[in-house]
């Protein structure tokens, strides 16, 4: 019996269902139910919440979410070997766990939500974690279909998500994430907590969507950030040339010094340049 419910410990679940982690699926199983409960509590309040979980594996986080009061969990699992273990959890929490055997990169959970808002809570497979986050950050319309994300990443990715100007990890991901969300690293988890242990420390990050991000066209913002950080050590007057407009004109119209580098520009500066880029291109 585990610490949070009357289901078997996760090591026993893995043994029963022969769930060896597959590197090809980016799997690292978190077996400490105290840690999975800590992740679940980070998404509080859970009462009456619908949770979308990606890559539940043997179900440690799934169990924590349900035990701590989530009304409904939609668990999207690509690995068919994990489905029987999740079905055992569903039997323990009847009517509260919906198991989807599918690929989170292509599966859209919104039709299952019946118009209700949800929270995304997941120990994401490392090999698709960043792209999944970008998919969620670029969803339209905004505000999005979720009202919170509590996600685990490699520490280096977590630092990029929360980074702001003049920080070493600041880049395209930080611009997009902090433009649309309030972000925070909540805590780290050591490699020893996982089976198999990854080579790096993991971080749990919370992202809360902003109801009204600074107004600009998202695609223009992504283009400006991609150009600027594509040559991050060069001044904007050089790095922005790839946009096909006069970089000096663009920066000046946005109130940004074209002799500065991308890593020193706040999100408001990127937003201003994105708006000016849209105006310049609309002029033909």
Curated annotation (Swiss-Prot):
Subcellular location: Cytoplasm
Species this protein is from: Bradyrhizobium diazoefficiens (strain JCM 10833 / BCRC 13528 / IAM 13628 / NBRC 14792 / USDA 110)
Keywords (A to Z) from UniProt: Cytoplasm, Methyltransferase, RNA-binding, rRNA processing, S-adenosyl-L-methionine, Transferase
Similarity remark: Belongs to the class I-like SAM-binding methyltransferase superfamily. rRNA adenine N(6)-methyltransferase family. RsmA subfamily.
Any one Pfam family match given in the protein's UniProt record, by short name: RrnaAD
Biological-process GO terms, alphabetical: rRNA methylation
Gene Ontology terms for molecular function: 16S rRNA (adenine(1518)-N(6)/adenine(1519)-N(6))-dimethyltransferase activity; RNA binding; rRNA (adenine-N6,N6-)-dimethyltransferase activity
Listed EC numbers: 2.1.1.182
Domain of life: Bacteria
Main location: cytoplasm
Reaction catalyzed: adenosine(1518)/adenosine(1519) in 16S rRNA + 4 S-adenosyl-L-methionine = N(6)-dimethyladenosine(1518)/N(6)-dimethyladenosine(1519) in 16S rRNA + 4 S-adenosyl-L-homocysteine + 4 H(+)
Entry annotated with the keyword Cytoplasm: yes
Function: Specifically dimethylates two adjacent adenosines (A1518 and A1519) in the loop of a conserved hairpin near the 3'-end of 16S rRNA in the 30S particle. May play a critical role in biogenesis of 30S subunits.
Organism phylogeny: Bacteria, Pseudomonadati, Pseudomonadota, Alphaproteobacteria, Hyphomicrobiales
Keyword RNA-binding: yes
Name of the protein in question: Ribosomal RNA small subunit methyltransferase A
List of residues binding S-adenosyl-L-methionine: 28, 30, 55, 77, 103, 123
PROSITE patterns: RRNA_A_DIMETH, SAM_RNA_A_N6_MT
GO cellular component: cytosol
């Amino acid at each position: 019996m585990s610490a949070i419910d009357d289901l078997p410990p996760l090591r026993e679940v893995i043994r029963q269902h022969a769930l060896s982690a597959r590197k090809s699926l980016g799997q690292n199983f978190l077996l400490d139910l105290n840690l999975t409960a800590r992740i679940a509590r980070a998404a509080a309040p859970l009462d009456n919440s619908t949770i979308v979980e990606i890559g539940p594996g043997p179900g440690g986080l799934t169990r924590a979410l349900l035990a701590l009061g989530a009304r409904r969990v939609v668990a999207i699992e690509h690995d068919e070997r994990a489905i029987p273990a999740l079905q055992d959890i569903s039997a323990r929490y009847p009517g509260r766990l919906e198991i989807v055997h599918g690929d989170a990169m292509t599966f859209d959970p919104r039709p299952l939500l019946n118009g209700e808002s949800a929270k995304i809570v997941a120990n994401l497979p490392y090999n698709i974690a960043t792209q999944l986050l970008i998919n969620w950050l670029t969803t339209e319309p905004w505000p999005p279909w979720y009202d919170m994300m509590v996600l685990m990443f490699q520490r280096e990715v977590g630092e990029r998500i929360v980074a702001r100007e003049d920080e070493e990890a600041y880049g395209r991901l930080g611009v997009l994430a902090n433009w649309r969300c309030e972000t925070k690293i909540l805590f780290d988890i050591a490699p020893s907590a996982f089976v198999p242990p990854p080579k790096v420390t993991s971080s749990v990050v919370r992202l809360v969507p902003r109801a009204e991000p600074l107004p600009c066209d998202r695609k223009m913002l992504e283009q400006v950030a991609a150009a600027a950080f594509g040559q991050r050590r060069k001044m904007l007057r050089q790095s922005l040339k790839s946009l096909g407009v006069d970089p000096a004109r663009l920066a000046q119209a946005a109130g940004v010094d074209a002799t500065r580098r991308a890593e020193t520009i706040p999100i408001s500066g990127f937003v201003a340049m994105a708006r000016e880029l849209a105006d310049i291109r609309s002029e033909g």
